[in-house]
Amino acid sequence: NPGNILDLGSGTGASYSDLKNFDVTALDPDEQMLSLNNFEKKIIGKGEELPFNENSFDNVLCCVVWRNVDDTEKALSEVNRVLKPGGKFILLDMTRPKNTFYKLSHKIGTYILLHFVGLITLNLKEYRFLYKSLDFYPQPEVHLTKNNYTNLVIERIGLFDFVYLGVFTK
């Protein structure tokens, strides 16, 4: 039993089908996105100022939104505050590969693909942001080790290792 879960940056609730049978609180700063979310408990808020008491959640989940957090250091501190002792923070996101060849290939490939998709969907601004965010977000192995968690595990997965999964235990 994973206990109660905070879905940080829940947006439209993409994780709903996997988590619908659990006690989940969806948090997102965008009220319009939350209105499309199927979770019962929905709260408007940001990761940097979590509106919960200390030790409120057994687990915190954050999927493909960490690069959109304005102050990740503050958000890490807030997640640590609301997690119960022994609780886990599970973070899934994207970054550039570490290998120089893969990094260059990934940069060229994502530039072409994301700009193409942006043009087709008439959302070029959003896809440009996604492309740029892969460069200005520091490598997770450097950034995520600056916290109060123990048993930190960061695993790169997928083609070119540009997707990573971070699991932290409080």
Regions found by a protein language model. Name each.
Residues 73-85:
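A short glycine-rich, Lys/Arg-flanked "PGG" loop and its adjoining helix->strand segment in the class I
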Residues 15, 27, 95-145:
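C-terminal alpha-helical "lid/dimerization" subdomain adjacent to the S-adenosyl-L-methionine
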Residues 59-72:
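A short SAM/SAH-binding and catalytic strip from SAM-dependent methyltransferases
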